[in-house]
């Protein structure tokens, strides 16, 4: 074998290496779609609600499930993810929840041609699970606006939190289910705030 061939042999062998750069661990993806337990029909003349895009605060744009550590930090799961950005999933779930609440004749998204008088602007502020506390947590903050002609005014500001129990040693599917339940708890709290806020607005007219 020539000296040139000997020099090229290690390069050829390296090119045949097929070992992966990282372990071949399948990614698990989870839904985030808490549903209202019952569905109510809105009364005649109920308002139309527009929900603007729900955004996540910094740290909640990751797809990976978020675990709160005992030291106050957070860890993002590398192989366990939401199906889509959690704020997008929360927005779709919130629209369905509020439509089922019976408070509004319709709950629409930006781009809808439906005439609306109420606008919801919200952020997803919390979505994690805390093994040390045996709970999952979710939170939303924002404002409910009344829009008429070219003016608008704030009917309600809110910062709601939801919690759900989490068993010790829970795996990723159980943690995702607990976070979904916590988000549903936050939605229920928001619905109660809407009932009070809309009643106050009607009384003030």
Model-found features: residue ranges?
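Surface-exposed helix-capping loop/turn segments at secondary-structure junctions
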Residues: 102-107, 192-205
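N-terminal export leaders
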Residues: 3-7
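Surface-exposed short loop/turn segments
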Residues: 17-31, 35-40, 101-151
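Short secondary-structure boundary motifs at beta->alpha junctions and helix caps
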Residues: 75-81, 150-192
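Soluble periplasmic/extracytoplasmic beta-strand elements of cell-envelope proteins
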Residues: 48-53, 66, 119-124, 139-145, ...
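Extracytoplasmic/secreted envelope proteins and their assembly/folding machinery
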Residues: 87, 91, 95, 101, ...
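A structural "domain/chain start" motif
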Residues: 16-86, 198-205
């Amino acid at each position: 074998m020539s000296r040139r061939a000997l020099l090229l042999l290690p390069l050829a062998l390296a090119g045949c290496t097929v070992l992966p750069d990282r372990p071949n661990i399948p990614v698990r993806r989870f839904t985030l779609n808490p549903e209202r337990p019952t569905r109510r029909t809105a009364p005649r003349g109920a308002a139309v609600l527009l929900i603007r895009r729900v955004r996540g605060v910094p740290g909640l744009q990751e797809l990976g499930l978020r675990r709160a550590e005992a030291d106050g930090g957070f860890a993002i799961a590398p192989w366990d993810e939401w199906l889509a950005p959690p704020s997008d999933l929360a927005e779709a779930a919130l629209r369905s929840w509020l439509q089922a609440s019976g408070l509004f004749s319709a709950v629409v998204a930006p781009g809808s041609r439906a005439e609306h008088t109420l606008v919801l602007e919200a952020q997803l502020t919390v979505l994690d699970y805390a093994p040390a506390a045996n709970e999952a947590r979710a939170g939303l903050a924002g404002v409910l606006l009344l829009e008429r002609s070219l003016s608008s005014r704030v009917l309600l500001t809110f910062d709601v939190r939801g919690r759900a129990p989490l068993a010790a040693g829970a795996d990723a599917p159980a943690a995702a289910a607990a976070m979904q339940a916590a988000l549903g708890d936050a939605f229920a709290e928001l619905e109660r705030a809407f009932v009070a806020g809309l009643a106050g607005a009607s009384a003030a007219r």
